[in-house]
Amino acid sequence: MLQPKQTNWVILAGGQARRMGGQDKGFVTFQDKPLIEHALDTLRSQTDHIAINANRSIDNYSRYTVTFKDEFTDYPGPLAGMHAGLVNMASDWVGFIPCDSPNLPNNLISLLCNAVKDDTDIVVAHDGEYMQPVVTLMHKRIIPKIDAFLARGDRKIILLYKECNTVFADFSDYPNAFINLNSPQELEQFGTLL
């Protein structure tokens, strides 16, 4: 069975944040601290192996932990950050969370690791109703598949998951875990719920 200590983790903070008015979402304040700090707190309670993927504010993110850009200039979405994480991190298994989900559970890593089987390429969190495509754990052996996927212009992570041996980790006991804060309205709406 895959152990959490055998994994490295990347916080995805490389998006354009259009719905947030172009603000760097990692530095948007939620409950008195930047969203990036919520993500770091979640992971630090479970692992020491954390990096950030960002395409701007690199110096600011680097104050927290190792930070790297992805190699794509056209913002192909979270898959670019996942590719960068798989290439840059040392372990065979690399996990990913978004910077804008401040309510992820403190047993996230163990739940994802427990779902891994011998032939698993990717584990994706599932809340009982929907898959959560950017809360995931991936094996480095899929790098060539991501390369080919992006080279042909595909961007939808779910399509990549169909090309790989993907399994789901059950997070149905955590109904509010995957609230994603994409806009000022969502910050206000969920600020009192979480």
UniProtKB/Swiss-Prot annotation:
It comes from Aliivibrio salmonicida (strain LFI1238). One of its GO terms (molecular function) is GTP binding. It comes from the Bacteria. Its EC number is 2.7.7.77. This is Molybdenum cofactor guanylyltransferase. GTP binds at L12, A13, G14, K25, N53, D70, D100. CDD domains: MobA. Transfers a GMP moiety from GTP to Mo-molybdopterin (Mo-MPT) cofactor (Moco or molybdenum cofactor) to form Mo-molybdopterin guanine dinucleotide (Mo-MGD) cofactor. It catalyses: Mo-molybdopterin + GTP + H(+) = Mo-molybdopterin guanine dinucleotide + diphosphate. Its main location: cytoplasm. Pfam families: NTP_transf_3 (PF12804). Keywords: Cytoplasm, GTP-binding, Magnesium, Metal-binding, Molybdenum cofactor biosynthesis, Nucleotide-binding, Transferase.
